[in-house]
């Protein structure tokens, strides 16, 4: 769920559930609250030339393989303000036994989740793209 702090506080009082955990995040990512920043990001992306990727890319907005630079720009914009389709993304990746997933970023949260879902797939985590050679 995403919403204002006040709305989420009200909801947590009104519903009965086992656990209601508010995430400490810097923005309402992957929700309609990101529509305006997403539009600005889209304008920024129009100025950048994307090369054809060396390998297909999967976004959480549309969990399918994509190699089209223009479509990748659209997916980057759309995943800012749409829900994460994590299970579908993991299911797609599970179909490829030769897959090597690399999480690029400061934490290993996603690679940890992936290891639980994808038992036979190689998964690595690096802090920056500088650590990758292909």
Please place each PLM-identified region on the residue numbering.
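Acyl-group transfer acyltransferase/transacylase scaffold of fatty acid/polyketide systems
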Residues: 1-134
């Amino acid at each position: 769920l995403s919403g204002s702090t006040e709305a989420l506080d009200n909801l947590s009082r009104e519903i009965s559930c086992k656990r209601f955990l508010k995430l400490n995040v810097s923005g309402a990512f992957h929700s309609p609250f990101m529509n305006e920043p997403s539009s600005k990001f889209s304008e920024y992306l129009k100025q950048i030339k994307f090369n054809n990727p060396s390998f297909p890319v999967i976004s959480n907005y549309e969990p399918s393989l994509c190699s089209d630079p223009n479509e990748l720009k659209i997916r980057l914009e759309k995943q800012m303000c749409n829900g994460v389709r994590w299970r579908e993304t993991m299911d797609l990746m599970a179909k490829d036994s030769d897959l090597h997933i690399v999480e690029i970023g400061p934490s290993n949260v996603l690679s940890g989740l992936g290891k639980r879902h994808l038992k036979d797939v190689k998964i690595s985590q690096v802090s920056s793209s500088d650590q990758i050679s292909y």
